[in-house]
Amino acid sequence: GSDQQYVVALNKKDGGVAWRTDRTGEMNPNPQLKKSYGTPLILDTNGRPILYSPAADWLYTYDPNTGKELNKLNYGMLGFSIVPRPVAGHGLIYVITSFMRPQLLAIDYLSSNKPSIKWKWNRGVSNQPSAILVGDEIYFVSDSAGMVTCLDAHTGKEHWRERIGGNYSASPLQSNGRIYFHSREGKTTVIEAGKEFKVVSINQLDGQLMASAAVDDQALFLRSDKGLYRIERKRD
């Protein structure tokens, strides 16, 4: 928050505090620029579980059992109120710095004891929707104007950047080689995952889609401000 910055672990059985660790990195003195809402990840790192937690101006690593801070990586005063969930693959963690100066950072967390930035991208990066990693490509959509970018996940090289239109808060979803983008205007655009841009279908629902979609078996659940939709192919 703007007044306190810390990470806390709760006992899942009774809700009690297992540990709490304050953030230690220097931040912008403006309290509003100290906030972060990004969901942490726990990754196996050279044989041990490590908790990776994005924060304003920093990426922290902790021992998930004790809360002990292990390392922190300063990426500069680029972002605050971090919303997107980081994703991991290919020995990298992909972190979006969110508001103020949104960038996508590819952070190497396996090559040494301390994470380091391998590459970064700063064009059309989202503030709220998370990026999505599909195979060797990573995709993200801008909050406004609906610009989708596809990068090589290893190098950060751009494969394509295309406009699908609309404004976005929901994170994209992938299934069976297709990626689904849900706009605030109620439009779902489905594209083929890959190095070439190809739209498969466009569908329209009543109301705004701001929440990310959920999946159960063969059903897709979409929540708009008008209702909850279950979309599923009819079974034989």
Model-predicted regions and their roles:
Residues 1-236:
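Noncatalytic, solvent-exposed loop/strand surfaces
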